[in-house]
Amino acid sequence: MGTVLSLSPSYRKATLFEDGAATVGHYTAVQNSKNAKDKNLKRHSIISVLPWKRIVAVSAKKKNSKKVQPNSSYQNNITHLNNENLKKSLSCANLSTFAQPPPAQPPAPPASQLSGSQTGVSSSVKKAPHPAVSSAGTPKRVIVQASTSELLRCLGEFLCRRCYRLKHLSPTDPVLWLRSVDRSLLLQGWQDQGFITPANVVFLYMLCRDVISSEVGSDHELQAVLLTCLYLSYSYMGNEISYPLKPFLVESCKEAFWDRCLSVINLMSSKMLQINADPHYFTQVFSDLKNESGQEDKKRLLLGLDR
């Protein structure tokens, strides 16, 4: 029974190759067949591995060749660009160093024409004088300074000379009229600070110089016209939007006051805008007001000499 069990596997193996009894030869044959199969498997694996290695090597060479080719082409492009730039630089250098020939000079005119042209030029030069060129392109800057009290005194003297019919008018009277209006507006709270300043006095003088006539017959009339000019000065130069009318009225009829205001506006509107926009005009009016005091001194001197 043990023999049968030991031979039964060999019998099954033997049937794989050929029919026959199970012997030791069959075992060797089976073993040889196994070895042959192993050899064949090894050969096939070796054969399959060798082409794979070759394929990998070939693909690596192709990749290296692809990587190398762009570098070589890039180097070729760089050398080509360098050559082109060198050619351009040489051409630019040639253009920059190129010197144009001097233009041909016209032929000299005959001596007779030359003498005639010279005499004509000299005569024309003698006839046409050179225009005078001013050294200073801008107008001369004039600086004038004066205090408020000094300008008010000049304004009072101007009014006294203008209204020559008013024999009892003093230069301080117009100043008192102006000061009283300014003080009343301060006390009533219509303004935070006094309006009587040098600039505003200059503006008032500009109005009075063209509005107040020399035919004024009374102090009351002069005061009415002067306060009308003062009201317009407040309205144009003051800090507040509006001012009360009562401090400026010296008569019961308001229509007469407004009529004077309209006439002054129609007459002096352009100059009121000019003195605010043109500093040279303001300086000129300032100088004229300051010179009013000097004119009074000259008048007194002439009266003394006549006596």
From Swiss-Prot:
This is Cyclin-dependent kinase 5 activator 1. Residues 112-125 have a biased composition (Polar residues). The modification Phosphothreonine is found at T138. One of its GO terms (molecular function) is ionotropic glutamate receptor binding. Belongs to the cyclin-dependent kinase 5 activator family. The p35 form is proteolytically cleaved by calpain, giving rise to the p25 form. P35 has a 5 to 10 fold shorter half-life compared to p25. The conversion results in deregulation of the CDK5 kinase: p25/CDK5 kinase displays an increased and altered tau phosphorylation in comparison to the p35/CDK5 kinase in vivo. Brain and neuron specific. One of its GO terms (biological process) is superior olivary nucleus maturation. A lipid is attached at G2 (N-myristoyl glycine). One of its GO terms (cellular component) is cytoplasm. Heterodimer composed of a catalytic subunit CDK5 and a regulatory subunit CDK5R1 (p25) and macromolecular complex composed of at least CDK5, CDK5R1 (p35) and CDK5RAP1 or CDK5RAP2 or CDK5RAP3. Only the heterodimer shows kinase activity. Interacts with EPHA4 and NGEF; may mediate the activation of NGEF by EPHA4. Interacts with RASGRF2. The complex p35/CDK5 interacts with CLOCK. The record marks F98, A99 as: Cleavage. The keyword Ubl conjugation applies. InterPro entries: CDK5_activator, Cyclin-like_sf. Residues 97-135 are annotated as: Disordered. Residues 100-110 have a biased composition (Pro residues). Keywords: Biological rhythms, Cell membrane, Cell projection, Cytoplasm, Lipoprotein, Membrane, Myristate, Nucleus, Phosphoprotein, Ubl conjugation. Pfam families: CDK5_activator. The modification Phosphoserine is found at S8. The keyword Protein biosynthesis does not apply. p35 is a neuron specific activator of CDK5. The complex p35/CDK5 is required for neurite outgrowth and cortical lamination. Involved in dendritic spine morphogenesis by mediating the EFNA1-EPHA4 signaling. Activator of TPKII. The complex p35/CDK5 participates in the regulation of the circadian clock by modulating the function of CLOCK protein: phosphorylates CLOCK at 'Thr-451' and 'Thr-461' and regulates the transcriptional activity of the CLOCK-BMAL1 heterodimer in association with altered stability and subcellular distribution.
